[in-house]
Structures are given as structure tokens and as C-alpha cells.
């Protein structure tokens, strides 16, 4: 019979498999569209008639275009070919209303060549804002000299409180697509996602759908945005075009809807931008692989979390465990969380880091045998006593830290002084957190040496939570994949590869010091005792 723990793990794995299969089925339903099988109720593509088309892009400050007044033509592509990819950069005049925190819209028309858009009954058009509102990025300065790379003219005129208010930012890219497949839709089962982009006309006895025009909003990244100052009169706009297949179009529509839903649920523009980066900066096939990798990452995260908590919850002794390594992991995890918070990193990275910091704080409480007593609103901390075996482990631990400090502290202090002299920061707090985190990332693996030293002196690794380590080892290699996909600070990205080395060293020690099955573990049990224990007969 399965134990309760095994049954729970099997249940989690089973739910995970069902989730992956269901997601694959949903994705198949998105990219595959059943064509019309008969002549009745079929909707034919207008592009199959090979019409001569023209692409026109206008700008205006009005969200609803009633007439051809007060609009500016910024791009006109005559003899527009749906199959031909292009990219053009134009200068757009910025009206006074837009410079005063107003909005500027782009109207994209696809119409018959030689006919004005508003005189063409078979034209299709879409509207897209060319501006968005965001709080300007804080200016970075040299903390010693006060110098900055760029001085914001408008910032000098505004009070400090006004710098935290959202201002208009320019979107320098406008990515356009037209569905180029001559696909015949079944009118009785039109996909809802594509239907809202379709415009139908009656030609004789046949219903046709006009060219499906699509604006790729996922290509608008926060890193490309430009602040619009009151002195700005012209700004560059790069208009790009490429054809798109029906399957990719439907997938892209769903992804845009998902990003929009995140913003409706309270995600900031920057958080949503991190999700955009996964789709825009990644090949579609690699993206599919990433989905499966992410699913396994989620599974291993849960299993590692479950086994790690279970291990530390039952642990009563610190024999063979480096207390200094536990303290360091707690300090480094908290510093990394504060650094990611200061860098305004995506919630996709920030939330797991925060949960990890809370768990490490709890581990410190267990490692120090700490008891918290409340005297009114003031807490008092009492530390437990160590046994003779634990004091021996602590002695090895202190010895390792003594040698390590000779190398580590000068490197960290030197790095902090160098960054203060040569790198610009938003504030002294930002410099302090960056100095700490650079020390953690650059030399953090050195703090794993005390645990490795304790393992060496005891000639044993049986006291380590190997099941949790195994799941974490899988995840650290998965993190290597995500390091190239999700936007994050470079130092955090490099730390993912550093963890690979740490786990390889642990695996080497596990091979070097095989577990003695007669040895009593930290729970007072040995493998041979459990094997010889008679089952209950009642």
C-alpha cells in the first residue's frame, strides 16, 4: 500500500500530467481552424481576387475619426503587396496637446489603390495609441560628484513630487500584420478571436471577408519608450509590416488578450512587459518548448518546497549542518529580494524570491533553535543549547568561515568602493543594495564552502536534504533556460549558472562519501533498522 506521502506526491504528478495534456489540447484548438467543407455558408477571402491595395497611416489626437480634418498622413505605401515584408522609419509631428500629456493615435487604413480611405467602402482600418502613460525612470547619478549622463530638462522645472506622476511616453514602433492565408471560413463556426477582426461584404451570392489587418501590440516594449517633453516637436516612428498565418494570428490574439487581462488584474505596464518579452523575443517553437520547461519547473518547485519544508520541520539537530551556511543563505536571499524590488523586476521573478526569503528566515529560526517570547508588543529571542556533536560541527563551521573571511571581505569592500567611484545609482540605498547583491552573486558560492568543509571533515553527506536538493538541481538547470528568456538583471542571470557548479560539487561529494546504511540519521533511525522492523499485525 502506498504511504500518505507517496500518494500525495503521485496525486500532484497526476494533476500535473492532466494539466499539460489539457493545455496541449487547448493550444491545438487555438492554432487549428476547421476549413469550410461545402459551398453553403462559406466565407471566401477577398484577397483571392488579387485587388490592388494601398496602405495609409495617419495620426490624430482624436480617438474617433469622424472626417478627414485635423489628421496628418505619415506613411503612404502605394501598390501594397501583402506578401512583401518591409520596415520604414518616419518622423511624426507631435501636437501641442500631446506634448501637454495628451494622447496621439495612429489610424492604419488598408484600402484600394488610388482611392481615399473614407471614400472606399471596402477599406479596413484599425486604431492604435502611439503614446502611453508611465512614471519616468529615476535618473541615475554619481553619488560622490552628483553628475549624470543625461539631464532631464523638464525634471529641472518640476517639483520632486511631480516626478512620481505618470507622463506621456512615445511608442517608437508600430508593427502591422495582414493574414495572408487564402483560408475559407465556415460561417457557422467562425472562431470568436478572429471574428472581431473580420469585416464581411456580399459580392453576388458569395460572402467575402476583407483583408484581416492586425496590430502587434506585443512588440511595444517598455525599454523602447521615450519621454515626451514639452520641447519635443518631432519623434521617430518605425512602421514594420509582415504577413502572418492564421494559426499564428490566432495565437497572437490570445496572447495579447492575456497580457491585457494581467493589466486589468492590477499588473503594471512593466510587469506585463516582462510577459511580452517571453513571446516577442523568442522563436515560436522555442516558446512551445519553454512552456513544457516552465511546467516542469513549476512541478519541481512545488516538490522541492514540500520536501525542504518537511525536512526542516522534522529536524531537531544541527549535526553535520553548517549553521553559517544557513545564515548566509538567509542573508543573501533577503538581499536578492530587496535588490529585485529596487530594480522593479517583474512579479514573475519577485514573488518567488520573496517566498524564498521567508522560508530562509524560518530555517534560521530552526537552525539557531530560537524561541520567540512576546512581552506585550516587544519580542524576546532565546537561543537553544547545542549537544557535544553539534558543537563539533560548529567548530568545523567556524574554522571554515575564518579562512573564508580572509578572501571574501576584502573582495566585497573593494567591489563596493569601485562601484561607488565608477557607477551611477539612483540613491545611496540603491548603491548599498547593489553592493551587497554583487557580493552575493559574485562570491556567494564561496559561502557554500563551510558546508562542503563540514562534509569533508565528517566524511558524510547523509545529513543533507537530498530529495529537496535533487528537485532544486533540476530547477537550476531549467533556470539556465529562463535566464535567456525572462528579462532580469545581468548579475541575477549569471547567478543561475553559478548554482550549476555548486550542485555539481555536492553530487561529487555524494559519490565520494556514500551513505552508510547502518548510520543513525538525524531522526534517530537507520536504514537497516527500518528494513528489519516488523509490520503491525493488528
Swiss-Prot record:
Catalytic reaction(s) noted: a 6-(alpha-D-glucosaminyl)-1-(1,2-diacyl-sn-glycero-3-phospho)-1D-myo-inositol(in) = a 6-(alpha-D-glucosaminyl)-1-(1,2-diacyl-sn-glycero-3-phospho)-1D-myo-inositol(out); 6-(alpha-D-glucosaminyl)-(1-octadecanoyl,2-(9Z)-octadecenoyl-sn-glycero-3-phospho)-1D-myo-inositol(in) = 6-(alpha-D-glucosaminyl)-(1-octadecanoyl,2-(9Z)-octadecenoyl-sn-glycero-3-phospho)-1D-myo-inositol(out); a 1,2-diacyl-sn-glycero-3-phospho-(1D-myo-inositol)(in) = a 1,2-diacyl-sn-glycero-3-phospho-(1D-myo-inositol)(out); a 1,2-diacyl-sn-glycero-3-phosphocholine(in) = a 1,2-diacyl-sn-glycero-3-phosphocholine(out)
- Residue positions with a glycan: 91, 101
One cellular component term from this protein's GO annotations in UniProt: endoplasmic reticulum membrane
Which stretches are Cytoplasmic in the membrane topology?
1-10, 306-324, 365-402, 450-538
One GO biological-process annotation of the entry reads: apoptotic process
Extracellular face: residue ranges?
Answer: 32-284, 343-346, 424-428
Specify the domain of life of the species encoding this protein. Eukaryota
Could you list this entry's UniProt keywords, alphabetically sorted. Apoptosis, Endoplasmic reticulum, Glycoprotein, Lipid transport, Membrane, Transmembrane, Transmembrane helix, Transport
Q: Which GO terms describe its molecular function?
A: phospholipid scramblase activity
State its location(s): Endoplasmic reticulum membrane
Tell me which PANTHER family the record gives: CLEFT LIP AND PALATE ASSOCIATED TRANSMEMBRANE PROTEIN-RELATED, LIPID SCRAMBLASE CLPTM1L
Summarize the protein's role. Answer: Scramblase that mediates the translocation of glucosaminylphosphatidylinositol (alpha-D-GlcN-(1-6)-(1,2-diacyl-sn-glycero-3-phospho)-1D-myo-inositol, GlcN-PI) across the endoplasmic reticulum (ER) membrane, from the cytosolic leaflet to the luminal leaflet of the ER membrane, where it participates in the biosynthesis of glycosylphosphatidylinositol (GPI). GPI is a lipid glycoconjugate involved in post-translational modification of proteins.
Name listed for the protein in its UniProt record: Lipid scramblase CLPTM1L
Q: Which organism is it from?
A: Pongo abelii
This protein's gene is called: CLPTM1L
Amino acid at each position: 500500500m502506498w504511504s500518505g506521502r507517496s500518494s500525495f506526491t503521485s496525486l500532484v504528478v497526476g494533476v500535473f500530467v492532466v494539466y499539460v495534456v489539457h493545455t496541449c489540447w487547448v493550444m491545438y484548438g487555438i492554432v487549428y481552424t476547421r476549413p469550410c467543407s461545402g459551398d453553403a455558408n462559406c466565407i471566401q477571402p477577398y484577397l483571392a481576387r488579387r485587388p490592388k491595395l494601398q496602405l495609409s497611416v495617419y495620426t490624430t489626437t482624436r480617438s474617433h475619426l469622424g472626417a478627414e480634418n485635423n489628421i496628418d498622413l505619415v506613411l503612404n505605401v502605394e501598390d501594397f503587396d501583402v506578401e512583401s515584408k518591409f520596415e520604414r522609419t518616419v518622423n511624426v509631428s507631435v501636437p501641442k496637446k500631446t506634448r501637454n500629456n495628451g494622447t496621439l493615435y495612429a489610424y492604419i487604413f488598408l484600402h484600394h489603390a488610388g482611392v481615399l480611405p473614407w471614400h472606399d467602402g471596402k477599406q479596413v482600418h484599425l486604431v492604435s495609441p502611439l503614446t502611453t502613460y508611465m512614471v519616468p525612470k529615476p535618473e541615475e547619478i554619481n553619488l560622490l560628484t552628483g553628475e549624470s549622463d543625461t539631464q532631464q530638462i523638464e525634471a529641472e522645472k518640476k517639483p520632486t513630487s511631480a516626478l512620481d506622476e505618470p507622463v506621456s511616453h512615445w511608442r517608437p514602433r508600430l508593427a502591422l500584420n495582414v493574414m495572408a492565408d487564402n483560408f475559407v471560413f465556415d460561417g457557422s463556426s467562425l472562431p470568436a478571436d478572429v471574428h472581431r477582426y473580420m469585416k464581411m461584404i456580399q459580392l453576388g451570392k458569395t460572402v467575402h471577408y476583407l483583408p484581416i489587418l492586425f496590430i502587434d501590440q506585443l512588440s511595444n516594449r517598455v525599454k523602447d519608450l521615450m519621454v515626451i517633453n514639452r520641447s519635443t516637436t518631432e519623434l521617430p516612428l518605425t512602421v514594420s509590416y509582415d504577413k502572418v498565418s492564421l494559426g499564428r494570428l490566432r495565437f497572437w490574439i490570445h496572447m495579447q488578450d492575456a497580457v491585457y487581462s494581467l493589466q486589468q488584474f492590477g499588473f503594471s505596464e512593466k510587469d506585463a512587459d516582462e510577459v511580452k518579452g517571453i513571446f516577442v523575443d523568442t522563436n515560436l517553437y522555442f516558446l512551445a518548448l519553454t512552456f513544457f520547461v516552465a511546467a516542469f519547473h513549476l512541478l519541481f518547485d512545488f516538490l522541492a518546497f514540500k520536501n525542504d519544508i518537511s525536512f526542516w520541520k522534522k529536524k531537531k539537530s544541527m549535526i553535520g549542518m553548517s549553521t553559517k551556511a544557513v545564515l548566509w543563505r538567509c542573508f543573501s536571499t533577503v538581499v536578492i529580494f530587496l535588490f529585485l524590488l529596487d530594480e522593479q523586476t517583474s512579479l514573475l521573478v519577485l514573488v518567488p524570491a520573496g517566498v524564498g526569503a521567508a522560508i530562509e528566515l524560518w530555517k534560521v529560526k530552526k537552525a539557531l533553535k530560537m524561541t520567540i517570547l512576546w512581552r506585550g508588543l516587544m519580542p524576546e529571542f532565546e537561543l537553544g543549547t547545542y549537544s557535544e556533536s553539534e558543537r563539533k560541527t560548529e567548530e568545523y563551521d567556524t574554522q571554515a568561515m575564518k579562512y573564508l573571511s580572509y578572501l571574501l571581505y576584502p573582495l566585497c569592500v573593494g567591489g563596493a568602493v569601485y562601484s561607488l567611484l565608477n557607477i551611477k545609482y539612483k540613491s545611496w540605498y540603491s548603491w548599498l543594495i547593489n553592493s551587497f547583491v554583487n557580493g552575493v552573486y559574485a562570491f556567494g558560492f564561496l559561502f557554500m564552502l563551510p558546508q562542503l568543509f563540514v562534509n569533508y571533515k565528517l566524511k558524510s553527506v547523509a545529513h543533507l536534504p537530498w530529495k529537496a536538493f535533487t528537485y532544486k538541481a533540476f530547477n537550476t538547470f531549467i533556470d539556465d533556460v529562463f535566464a535567456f528568456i525572462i528579462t532580469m538583471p545581468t548579475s541575477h542571470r549569471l547567478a543561475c549558472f553559478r548554482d550549476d557548479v555548486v550542485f555539481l560539487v555536492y553530487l561529487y561529494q555524494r559519490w565520494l562519501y556514500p551513505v552508510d546504511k547502518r548510520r543513525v540519521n538525524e531522526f534517530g533511525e537507520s536504514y537497516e533498522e527500518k528494513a528489519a522492523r516488523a509490520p503491525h499485525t493488528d
